[in-house]
Regions:
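Alpha-helical transmembrane segments of integral membrane proteins
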Residues: 5-15, 20, 36-50, 389-717
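Membrane-entry signal-anchor segments at the cytosolic-membrane interface
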Residues: 25-41
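Ser/Thr/Pro/Gly-rich low-complexity linker/stalk segments immediately outside membranes or between
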Residues: 54-73, 643-651
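Extracytosolic and intramembrane catalytic regions of membrane-associated proteins
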Residues: 104-141, 145-153, 187, 269, ...
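C-terminal domain-closing interface element
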Residues: 234-253, 383-407
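Membrane-proximal extracellular juxtamembrane segment immediately upstream
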Residues: 348-367, 428-443, 841-876
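Cytosolic-side membrane-insertion boundary helix
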Residues: 358-394, 410-419
């Protein structure tokens, strides 16, 4: 009985100590008015460190400094060339500007480089490639005729290497865009890099091929022409692809390899201003970014491994008439030029180039830290690191719980029970931190208020980041304030919140690693610094000394906070402009809200619960809610209207269409004109309807049920994919088409067995045409003169078939045949439908007066990518 009394007395003393510690909680807690300072500290850190480093660009080198800075990229010279290209205007494939003027200019500039070349060290070979071909591009056959590339090979005379480094960018532009950023910027950088290579005493072992691709925008034809047909393509062992989704700023490395981590090692060793992340690669390859690059063509048809880099700053001007010289700084040219020149010298001397397949070792995990340095490791190493630190986190949490039990005298089960409750609270906070921003995105979409942040990106702070922060804080704070009888001291309870978040991240890290998602490195970074702080606190016994552990904890969270806020700030800067061209089917606010939520969870997941160090933590949450409400009120005012003239425009793609539907007997069943809109963002035609008369506009759903391809001349695979969401605005006056598109039936031959028929056609028309072919019921396409890929995979490619055709330097008509079979052998009745569209993209093609007036009436916040088009449907 004495032992029982002694044990009871000890339990009473422990309980008394705990109650005393909890009673002293309010006295020891930091005054509430310091809590805003705590939160503002992290905000100030973001603006003081992250934003300047994100915007940092090296000082441009001038031509007058070249003698004192030998071997360095000279941005001033490149900028002068950029101004020349800007003044040339749009360079549309098929126009004289692209096919002759631009080619001649490129040859002159290469000759200027040859004139200053060290002839004792280097030699230059130039080839103007003209090629025709075809390949399967998503859901269409992409055919091209006489596209042109200017190809330059630079070699060191003393080297016998037959392994080439390929550097690619494109010279053509989108209709209506000068394309100074996309991609004249990269073209002039390549020219200056070429110049620096051939005037330097530092030679390189492997020849460098500069591909000035003349047909990227229509789409990706020049790169296919080179890799499938050029005499130097078979020797290309590695690639640096240069493109742009913006104008100015830093270029981001967003794809690498695949399966060639040695390229990342050279990027780490060579790039002076690294900007890269595995997360961007996985997002891009998941199709969340509405773009494609030549990198895919070289990868799939080479295959050539490489690095895919693109300018992504100020994406508002991408593919618009505002992509001009004046929005690109000289310092941004210096940034890209220094990186490219160093990379070319590094890979140009790489021993791996002799046998790249021998160094194919799997995917890489890669990222830069604030642009200061670059980290990469192979995926297998990443798996080991992720598992090790996840397990280390779980083990140290268990050690901490045991330590709490030993110090307080509570049973391990009681401490574990408290941790279990806190884990549930942390899990609820994680769900709320993700769910509240998503809920905001859904509500704004339901109220037709998407894209309110498009021109004023700071609105995402109140719309998505603060709700996520509230979600992180709310469950833990409510638990602490409403539960008065805590078994553990307050300092330990706060540590339990961090432990719960650590366990959650460790579990997520293990799961994502198991399914092969390399972006799990983000959780590794969080775990690394938390595990380090916890280990030091346990060893130094700060773990058991009130709130002293929180000092080291916050210090160790500085670097993760800086990295995660930098990373997700970068993503928001890149992706927000893209939301206005992401299409109408998906709510773009969902993507932005997820990015904001993930950034908040990773940057503040360990830090947010620490508001409970202060008195009245609920008042902080109320204050944040008031700030969120204020932002919401601002967002539904004129400030939240998405578009602004020139700086952040609404993209409107529309065609002035003349349609004619011919029946089997030659009669015309439809002959009309109108404007066909391929809408680009979630707001659809609403902003136009508020500023101009488009009252007759109709949806195409009913047309899609009755007409092949909805009865409209969709341009390429993206237009065709979105055709059911398109709009049609009829007009009474006939659209004047500045040319003709003619389909001529040359011959119809029925086979001897009577069950097959061959139709021979000749097609004449403008630089871009599409054929849509749909066999009727009981009919099957068995052969044609196009690529057989679609016919060989009938379960993947179903009618109507889309064949896209473009010519560049040669407008000769194409002849083709279609071979079909019909189970009943009746070929004197309708067998198939064929639609022919002709697109007149160039600004040299005149728009009729009514179309010009319609374009003029568009609001000033609209950029229209438009052209006349004809569409004729025949039944044979």
């Amino acid at each position: 009985s004495g032992l029982i009394e002694e044990d009871a007395s000890r339990q009473r003393n422990i309980l008394s100590t705990i109650i005393e510690l909890n009673a002293e909680k309010r006295q020891k807690a930091i005054p509430w008015y310091y809590a805003p300072t705590y939160l503002l500290f992290w905000l100030a850190l973001f603006f003081a460190v992250v934003v300047p480093l994100f915007n940092y660009l090296p000082t441009a080198v001038r031509e007058s400094e070249e003698s004192t800075k030998p071997g360095e990229f000279v941005a001033e010279r490149a900028q002068k060339l950029l101004l020349v290209l800007d003044r040339m205007g749009p360079k549309i494939v098929g126009d004289e500007m692209n096919e002759k003027t631009m080619v001649d200019w490129m040859l002159r500039e290469v000759d200027k480089v040859r004139q200053v070349m060290r002839e004792d060290l280097y030699e230059i070979e130039v080839d103007v490639q003209r090629a025709s071909g075809a390949y399967l591009h998503w859901e269409m056959i992409n055919m091209y005729q006489a596209v042109q590339n200017v190809v330059v090979k630079v070699s060191t005379k003393s080297s016998n290497s037959s392994n080439y480094l390929l550097i690619n960018s494109h010279t053509d532009t989108k209709p209506g865009s000068v394309g100074t950023g996309d991609a004249a910027f990269m073209v002039v950088v390549m020219l200056e890099v070429m110049r620096q290579l051939v005037i330097s005493e530092k030679t390189f072992e492997h020849p460098v091929v500069f591909l000035f691709n003349g047909a990227e925008e229509q789409p990706l034809q020049g790169s296919h022409a080179f890799i499938s047909q050029h005499k130097w393509s078979a020797n290309c062992r590695a690639l640096i692809n240069l493109d742009s989704a913006g104008a100015g700023g830093r270029e981001i490395l967003f794809q690498g390899g695949p399966n060639h981590p040695w390229l990342m090692r050279h990027y780490r060793e060579s790039a002076k201003h690294p900007f890269a992340t595995t997360m961007a690669e996985e997002i891009f390859q998941a199709g969340l970014i509405p773009s494609d690059t030549d990198f895919r063509i070289f990868r799939d048809f080479g295959p050539v491994p490489g690095l895919d880099m693109a300018g992504a700053y100020n994406g508002y001007v991408y593919h618009t008439k505002y992509d001009r010289f004046d929005v690109i700084s000289r310092d941004s040219l210096q940034n890209t030029g220094e990186n490219l020149l160093s990379l070319v010298r590094g890979i140009g001397n790489a021993p791996e180039m002799y046998n790249t397949e021998a160094h194919s070792e799997g995917h890489s995990v890669f990222f830069d830290f604030l642009g200061l340095f670059f980290v990469y490791y192979v995926q297998s190493t990443g798996v080991a690191l992720n598992i090790c630190f996840s397990i280390a986190g779980l083990v140290l949490v268990c050690v901490s719980l045991w330590r709490m039990s030993k110090v307080t005298g509570l049973s391990p089960g009681a401490v574990t029970g408290s941790f279990g409750i806190m884990f549930v609270m942390e899990l609820a906070g994680f769900v709320l931190a993700l769910g509240l921003p998503l809920l905001m995105a859904v509500f704004y979409d339901a109220g037709d208020r998407t894209l309110t942040y498009f021109s004023n990106s700071w609105l995402v702070i109140g719309l998505f980041i603060i709700p996520s922060l509230i979600g992180l804080m709310l469950p833990v704070t409510l638990y602490y304030t409403l539960q008065t009888n805590h078994k553990l001291p307050h300092g330990y309870n706060l540590q339990l919140a961090g432990h719960a978040h650590c366990v959650l991240l460790a579990l997520l890290c293990i799961i994502l690693t198991a399914v092969g998602i390399r972006t799990s490195y983000l959780f590794l970074i969080s775990l690394l610094f938390y595990v380090g702080a916890l280990a030091i606190n346990l060893l130094c016994k700060l773990h058991d000394r009130g709130f002293l552990w929180s000092i080291l904890f916050c210090i160790c969270q500085l670097l993760p906070f800086l990295y995660f806020s930098y990373l997700f700030h970068s993503f928001l800067v890149i992706t927000i402009p893209m939301t206005a061209r992401k299409g109408t089917e998906v709510n773009p606010d969902l993507l932005i809200s997820i990015l904001c939520a993930l950034g908040t969870i990773l940057a503040m997941g360990f830090l947010a619960p620490l508001i409970n160090l202060f008195r009245r933590p609920k008042s902080i949450i109320v204050g944040l809610a008031l700030i969120m409400f204020t932002f919401c009120m601002i967002s539904v005012s004129d400030v939240g209207f998405p578009y602004r003239p020139k700086t952040s425009v609404m993209r409107v793609n529309f065609l002035q269409v003349q349609r004619t539907f011919y029946e089997y007997d030659g009669s015309i069943s439809l002959d009309d004109s109108g404007y066909y809109f391929d809408l680009q963002d979630r707001r659809l035609e609403q902003p136009l309807a508020e500023t101009m008369d488009i009252s007759g506009i109709v949806h195409l759903e009913k047309e899609c049920e009755t007409q092949m391809m909805c009865g409209v001349p969709c341009f390429n695979h993206r237009w065709c994919e979105a055709r059911k969401a398109a709009r049609w605005l009829p007009r009474a006056q006939r659209v004047e088409i500045p040319g003709s598109t003619e389909l001529e039936l040359l011959n119809k031959t029925i086979s001897a067995d009577g069950y097959r028929v061959v139709y021979n056609f000749k097609l004449t028309g403008p630089g871009r045409m599409s054929l849509f072919i749909k066999p009727l019921s009981g009919v099957k396409m068995v052969d044609w003169s196009f690529l057989r890929g679609m016919l060989d995979k009938p379960f993947t490619y179903k009618p109507p078939y889309h064949i896209f055709f473009a010519w560049a330097a040669d407008d000769a008509p194409i002849e083709f045949y279609l071979e079909l079979t019909k189970f009943d052998g009746k070929f004197n009745e309708p067998v198939f439908e064929i639609g022919i569209s002709g697109h007149y993209l160039s600004q040299l093609h005149k728009r009729d007066a009514l179309s010009q007036q319609f374009i003029k009436d568009l609001p000033d916040f609209v950029h229209a990518m438009e052209w006349p088009a004809s569409y004729a449907r025949y039944v044979y």
